[in-house]
């Protein structure tokens, strides 16, 4: 095993990695949600007028669904949760405003992390999230969030530490690089993000706990020794480490149970109007009589435009206000709706 000492790593990639780790360690406290504010939310009983842990956790799951729907990366989701929690820990928020705040957190994070071509429009996010607010509402709330967080939105999160720890391990191990799955670790981090309690953990500690538990399952002495050196360099004391590792272990045990709705596997639910539901229902059982497409034939652009218009008409209800009592709504599993709308 290679030594993690800076002397041995002089002139190598390891020096830069440890330097970056020092920067992250200096920054992490500044971007953590106020513990006092999080504790107030934790102590709040569930009712209709006050923000409680259950509402916060449900909103984070909504953010995960939005990130999955728009194909956003894990960094966008984790940063959105960080922005959301930092704001909730500062302000006394009413439950009716939580949807708007959640959407704004997602949009702010996406603009920081994603490429321009992958940033969803405000209109699309409003429609898909069904947050019942306008583009003007989103703009005003984004301004409020940015001001309250002093425009420091690009935070150092547990995901930054997770990626850096993972890179440091691979830089110093002789074992196969694919043995430690970063995708699996990211999925586990997202599971922790869905619980308010882990927003109180230091990002460096949370990331190290996830890696430690995964390395233990691999039963790799070499990887464990590297982690111990990283822990020592990060100045993480045993009491803090073992406390959070126990909580993470319990969370992941529940996450892997059959009863748990896993963040990456939870099915999206789509609410559609009666007219759209009727169209989907009919198309499922009917066999469309389409003309045979000749080989080498030209694609008719006018037909494509007509079909797009038909689809947009059917989806008008997604961006409108909630249906009245006389209007029936149907719940469709997203995978089913996707199959019906986009046949292979």
Curated annotation (Swiss-Prot):
Gene coding for it: CCNG2
Signal peptide residue numbers: none
Tissue: High levels in cerebellum, thymus, spleen and prostate. Low levels in skeletal muscle.
Protein name: Cyclin-G2
One matching Pfam family: Cyclin_N
Disulfide-bonded cysteines: none
GO biological process, one term: cell division
Residue spans of biased composition, Acidic residues class: 301-313
UniProt entry keywords in alphabetical sequence: Cell cycle, Cell division, Cyclin, Cytoplasm, Mitosis
CC annotations in GO: cyclin-dependent protein kinase holoenzyme complex; cytoplasm; nucleus
PANTHER family, sorted: CYCLINS (PTHR10177)
InterPro entries: Cyclin (IPR039361), Cyclin-like_dom (IPR013763), Cyclin-like_sf (IPR036915), Cyclin_N (IPR006671)
Superkingdom assignment: Eukaryota
Biological role: May play a role in growth regulation and in negative regulation of cell cycle progression.
């Amino acid at each position: 095993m290679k030594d993690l000492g800076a002397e041995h790593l002089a002139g190598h990639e390891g020096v830069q990695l440890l330097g970056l780790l020092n920067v992250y360690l200096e920054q992490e406290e500044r971007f953590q949600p106020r513990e006092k504010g999080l504790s107030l939310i934790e102590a709040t009983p569930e009712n209709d007028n006050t923000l409680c842990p259950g509402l916060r956790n449900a909103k984070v799951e909504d953010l995960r669904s939005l990130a999955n729907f728009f194909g956003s990366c894990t960094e966008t989701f984790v940063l959105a949760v960080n922005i959301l929690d930092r704001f909730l820990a500062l302000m006394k928020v009413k439950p009716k405003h939580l949807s708007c705040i959640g959407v704004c957190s997602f949009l702010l994070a996406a603009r920081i992390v994603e490429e321009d071509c992958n940033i969803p429009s405000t209109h699309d996010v409003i429609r898909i999230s069904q947050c019942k607010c306008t583009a003007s509402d989103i703009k005003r709330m984004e301004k409020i969030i940015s001001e309250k967080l002093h425009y420091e939105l690009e935070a150092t999160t547990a995901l930054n530490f997770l990626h850096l720890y993972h890179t440091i391990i691979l830089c110093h191990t002789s074992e196969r690089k694919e043995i430690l799955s970063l995708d699996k670790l990211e999925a586990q981090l997202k599971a922790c993000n869905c619980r308010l309690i882990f927003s109180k953990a230091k990002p460096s500690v949370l990331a190290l706990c996830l890696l430690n538990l995964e390395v233990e399952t691999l039963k790799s002495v070499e990887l464990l020794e590297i982690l111990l050196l990283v822990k020592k360099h990060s100045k993480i004391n045993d009491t803090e480490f073992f406390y959070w590792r126990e909580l993470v272990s319990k969370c992941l045990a529940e996450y892997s149970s059959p009863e748990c709705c896993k963040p990456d596997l939870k099915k999206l639910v789509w609410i559609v109007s009666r007219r759209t539901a009727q169209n989907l229902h009919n198309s499922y059982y009917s066999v469309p009589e389409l003309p045979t497409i000749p080989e080498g034939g030209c694609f008719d652009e006018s037909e494509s435009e007509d079909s797009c218009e038909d689809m947009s008409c059917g989806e008008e209800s997604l961006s409108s206000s909630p249906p009245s009592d006389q209007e029936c709504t149907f719940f469709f599993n997203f995978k089913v709706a996707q199959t019906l709308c986009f046949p292979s």
